[in-house]
């Protein structure tokens, strides 16, 4: 498979502290990849750097185009969607209005895009006229996913989608992520729960202190490397 996203030698930091140190990886079209690592490993920083939300140096290419000179909005228009940590919805708006507002910048039929999202998330379709604040935590996270999908991204960046959810709700959210991936969208998923992330991602990239220390099919990752990533031993 050809690379949809290519990262080479990516470096980023905050206030003089290095958060990413020469990170290189690729994501193919339609591929789901889990970014795994302990707190502070650089997972969230990597996703933000891809959107231009934090300063970074290195070679970033998406669909053979250079992302470096592009502002965040231009990167989104190129086909990158982003769901940040936490549930980002407008609680006073209906589910449908949350989706339609997210699609305002797209020169397409928003109603068609809304129905496409509802096909992926039947629970949201059943509550389309309800206010977002009435949704469960898992449903709000699904709405966040749906809002990101209104731009029809070819690559979806997810930052800790199960954070703060009960195991049952987290399972529902990851089932939704699986449906997104099955529909052909590439997914780069930052997640602290390796067991949960690997239910949808056949490949994992392991980060420790801002560096890639493992990359490959899940079955190829040794127990020793996993212990180093999560426990430093």
PLM features: residue spans?
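Glycine-rich phosphate-binding loops of nucleotide-dependent enzymes
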Residues: 2-233
């Amino acid at each position: 498979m050809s690379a949809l996203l290519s990262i080479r030698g990516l470096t980023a930091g905050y206030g003089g502290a290095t958060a990413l140190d020469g990170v290189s990886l690729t994501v193919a079209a339609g591929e789901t990849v889990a970014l795994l690592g302990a707190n502070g490993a650089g997972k969230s920083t990597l996703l933000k750097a891809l959107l231009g939300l934090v300063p970074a140096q290195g070679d970033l290419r998406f669909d053979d185009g250079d992302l470096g000179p592009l502002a965040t909005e231009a990167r989104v228009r190129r086909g990158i969607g982003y769901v940040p940590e936490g549930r980002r919805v407008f609680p006073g708006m209906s589910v449908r209005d949350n989706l339609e507002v997210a699609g305002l910048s797209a020169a397409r039929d928003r109603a068609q895009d809304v129905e496409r999202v509802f096909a992926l998330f039947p629970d949201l379709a059943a509550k389309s006229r309800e206010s977002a604040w009435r949704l469960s935590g898992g449903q709000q996270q699904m709405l966040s996913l749906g809002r990101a999908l209104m731009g029809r991204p070819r690559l979806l960046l997810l930052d800790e989608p199960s954070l703060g959810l009960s195991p049952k709700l987290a399972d529902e959210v990851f089932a939704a992520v699986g449906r997104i991936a099955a529909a052909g969208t590439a997914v780069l998923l930052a997640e602290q729960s390796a067991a949960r992330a690997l239910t949808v991602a056949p490949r994992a990239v392991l980060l420790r202190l801002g560096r890639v220390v493992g990359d490959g099919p899940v079955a190829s990752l040794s127990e020793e490397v996993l212990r180093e990533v999560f426990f430093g031993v």
